[in-house]
Amino acid sequence: MNKSRFISCVILIFALILVLFTPNVLAESQPDPTPDELHKSSEFTGTMGNMKYLYDDHYVSATKVMSVDKFLAHDLIYNISDKKLKNYDKVKTELLNEDLAKKYKDEVVDVYGSNYYVNCYFSSKDNVGKVTGGKTCMYGGITKHEGNHFDNGNLQNVLIRVYENKRNTISFEVQTDKKSVTAQELDIKARNFLINKKNLYEFNSSPYETGYIKFIENNGNTFWYDMMPAPGDKFDQSKYLMMYNDNKTVDSKSVKIEVHLTTKNG
């Protein structure tokens, strides 16, 4: 074998190794949505206040708790009290599958998530479509407590850039005390800021036609959540929040977040 052929073989082998052992970033990334993929606020004729409620200071937050029960194989029930409005003292969080529920079943965890009441079931005896007193439900929102906090109670700032009609109009930071934080927690904090500063959701509608929040991880993978309700005259909070049931977490030090909004007259 001559020298040039030998070098070519070495390069080919090296390339094959890269293909086999390098993670395929593109395959795991969620492409940016096309305009047709996004929900449009003008096509929602219900009360936007029901969406606003999910992100306007109404969320479950607890530290160092353990599950005390379950209803189905893929959920966990916690003794968490609503210290603000006294609406509940039990919280059920539903996860994507049984394996994910088992992962956190006997762990000391922190819980942070948006919650709902209608169609929240803790047993087969609960009435369909009714509110179960003293109880609330959510999806995901779980992180292990041990070793997941910064020293001396320090907080991590996470930068969020907002683009309106493709132009960066504002940037702001939200804070978390967790090293590995759920995307849900950061989403809630981002939307809460935008509700207060940009009127993201009003009682009847929104000044924005479309919106999505995009997470960019350190390895280049991306994913996003649609920020507007589906078309129609009814908004199902439970169905909307189901997007968090995979309990997706990100590294708070490296994650980048973008919010993309289009105005109705843009």
Swiss-Prot record:
Changing residue 149 to A: Complete loss of emetic activity. GO terms for cellular component: extracellular region. Disulfide bonds join 120-137. Keywords: Disulfide bond, Enterotoxin, Metal-binding, Secreted, Signal, Superantigen, Toxin, Virulence, Zinc. Its main location: secreted. Residues 1-27 form the signal peptide. Gene3D superfamilies: 2.40.50.110, 3.10.20.120. This is Enterotoxin type C-2. Zn(2+) 1 binds at residues 36, 110, 145, 149. InterPro entries: Enterotoxin, Staph/Strept_toxin_CS, Staph_tox_OB, SuperAg_toxin_C, Superantigen_bac, Toxin_b-grasp_Staph/Strep, Toxin_bac. Possesses two zinc-binding sites. The zinc ion is necessary for the toxin interaction with MHC class II. Interacts with host MHC class II molecules composed of alpha/HLA-DRA and beta/HLA-DRB1 chains. It comes from the Bacteria. One of its GO terms (molecular function) is metal ion binding. Belongs to the staphylococcal/streptococcal toxin family. Staphylococcal enterotoxin that activates the host immune system by binding as unprocessed molecules to major histocompatibility (MHC) complex class II and T-cell receptor (TCR) molecules. In turn, this ternary complex activates a large number of T-lymphocytes initiating a systemic release of pro-inflammatory cytokines. Also causes the intoxication staphylococcal food poisoning syndrome. Pfam families: Stap_Strp_tox_C (PF02876), Stap_Strp_toxin (PF01123). It is found in: Secreted. Its cofactor is Zn(2+). Zn(2+) 2 binds at residues 74, 98, 107, 146.
